[in-house]
Curated annotation (Swiss-Prot):
Keywords: Chloroplast, Plastid, Ribonucleoprotein, Ribosomal protein. Coiled coil: none annotated. The keyword Plastid applies. One of its GO terms (molecular function) is structural constituent of ribosome. HAMAP family: Ribosomal_uS15_B. The lineage of its organism: Eukaryota, Viridiplantae, Streptophyta, Embryophyta, Tracheophyta. The keyword Ribonucleoprotein applies. This is Small ribosomal subunit protein uS15c.
Length: 86
């Protein structure tokens, strides 16, 4: 279940890079999703999940504007869908 960051991110980028933040948020989203499948009426966890999803989306938007090649590589490795463009 855990995402192997060493496959996605270089050694010197592991701490606070945008890519590592997106990976960590994706892992938290997966854990919270499993929790909410068992406890469907846990509304505070659901609110926290929505907050994490918004944070990941804003980081993905930032990454598309600054480094589109890295964005494409990251979403393919994490199995995420592309962002909708307006």
């Amino acid at each position: 279940m855990a995402i192997d960051l060493s496959l996605i991110i270089n050694e010197k980028e592991k701490k606070g890079s945008i890519e590592s933040q997106i990976c960590h948020l994706t892992e938290r989203i997966k854990r919270l999703t499993l929790h909410l499948k068992k406890h469907s009426k846990d509304y505070s966890s659901r609110k926290g999940l929505y907050k994490i999803v918004r944070r990941r989306k804003s980081l993905l938007v930032y990454l598309t504007k600054n480094n589109f090649v890295c964005y494409e590589k990251l979403i393919s490795q994490l199995g995420l869908r592309r962002l909708k463009t307006h």
